[in-house]
Regions:
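Unchanged
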Residues: 1-257, 369
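Left-handed beta-helix
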Residues: 1-14, 203, 211-375
Length: 375
């Protein structure tokens, strides 16, 4: 990890976009959804911050955060187990009879005292619905050079039909200034998609949050940024690297399988910027005589006796003799019994597929099996 004093603290919102993947967040947050064989979604943003020398990071949780706390622990894997700063899990603060926050402004309002007591000049904020290896130092440098009040990271991309809900797009002029911020933009063609990564001065953030809270506003993008594009100096920085967006079950399925392509895998996991995660001591993958594996990602602890094709298998998955797994994403400790057949299936943790069972979805509608279920 880089040792660099960039004078910035990080804030991650793990529950943002929980509503887009309800199947996967009944007992967890978006941030703790398993991804890419052995990681969680939060690992990517948190590792990016760690690699850029941001060592004071707060994760502002809302609900279902026990699995996230278990995964992050003290933050040791990210070099954030520190007496001063380090990794902080901030629970929802709500008085009796007061609802827990729903928008980013309310979330920030609940930690205003914390923000006011910090020493860093800048704040970088992010959600956890994207897997990206992001250079926050480049964002900070661009922000400082432009003299902006707020700088937004964006990606120029064509948003598929059916995935345009809960997205913000930007109109950016030739000087990089944001002139318009749109919610649920249904225009066709490539758009400037807001990656929900922001940097601004801590004092400016505190002022914006206080002003918004006084007026009963709750959404950072919609209520603050969009309504103040002509008042605030809002700049945008394009990101041209690899981004995996998780916005529904299909995208979760697709983005995992895309990593089977070595080009995509190397783009998300460059050697110079590693992604850290909770360590689990497992044996290497064991391939039993007669097994067959093609074009797949297999994490440590897997035992393969049958056939696996074009699939992503998380830690501890077992595919027994005669079983066939194709185009699947099987989470931790899934067991596929003898002669079962799976095609276009997503299993959550600790699922058991009984002997001879056949499950088949499609690329557009993969079958999902809930955590701890037996089929």
């Amino acid at each position: 990890m880089l040792s660099q004093n960039n004078n910035a603290l990080g804030i991650i919102f793990p529950n943002s976009y929980d509503n887009t993947v309800p199947e996967l967040v009944t007992e967890r947050t978006m941030a703790s959804i398993p991804f890419a064989g052995r990681y969680r979604m939060v690992d990517f943003i948190l590792s990016s911050m760690a690699n850029c020398g941001i060592s004071n990071v707060s994760i502002v949780v809302r609900k279902n955060y026990h699995s996230l706390m278990d995964h992050l622990g003290t933050g040791r894997e990210w070099d954030m187990a520190r007496r001063h700063g380090g990794l902080n899990i901030v629970p929802p603060f709500a008085e009796k009879g007061v609802r827990i926050y729903s928008g980013r402004v309310e979330a920030l309002g609940s930690i205003l005292n914390f923000l006011e007591n910090q020493k860093e000049k800048y704040v970088v904020m992010s959600d956890a619905n994207i897997a990206v290896n992001y250079d926050f130092n480049a964002l900070l440098a661009a922000h400082q050079a432009s003299g902006a009040d707020v700088t937004i990271a964006y990606q120029k991309v064509e948003i598929p039909e059916g995935r345009k809900n809960d997205n913000y797009t930007l109109t950016v002029d030739a000087d990089g200034r944001v002139t318009e911020l749109l919610f649920n933009d249904y225009r066709s063609g490539k758009q400037n998609l807001d990656l929900n990564i922001y940097v601004l001065e801590r004092e400016i953030l505190i002022k914006l949050v206080k002003d918004a809270a006084a007026r009963g506003l709750i959404y950072f993008e919609r209520d603050i940024l969009a309504h103040n594009v002509n008042i605030l100096n809002i700049r945008a920085l394009e990101y041209t690297g690899y981004v995996a967006h998780v916005c529904d079950m299909k995208s979760y399925f697709d983005e995992n399988l895309k990593l089977i392509d070595e080009k995509n895998l190397n783009a998300l996991f460059p050697k110079q910027s590693p992604v850290y995660t909770k360590i689990r001591d497992d044996n290497p993958v064991r391939y039993v005589t007669g097994s067959r594996v093609e074009s797949s990602i297999l994490a440590d602890g897997c035992v393969i006796e049958g056939t696996v094709e074009n699939s992503v298998l998380f830690r501890g998955v077992r595919v027994k003799k005669g079983a066939v797994v194709k185009n699947c994403v099987l989470m931790q400790d899934t067991v596929v019994e003898p002669n079962a057949e799976l095609d276009c299936v997503v299993t959550d943790k600790n699922v058991k597929i009984t002997a001879g069972k056949k499950l088949s979805g499609t690329e557009s509608f993969p079958v999902y099996v809930q955590k701890n279920h037996i089929v």
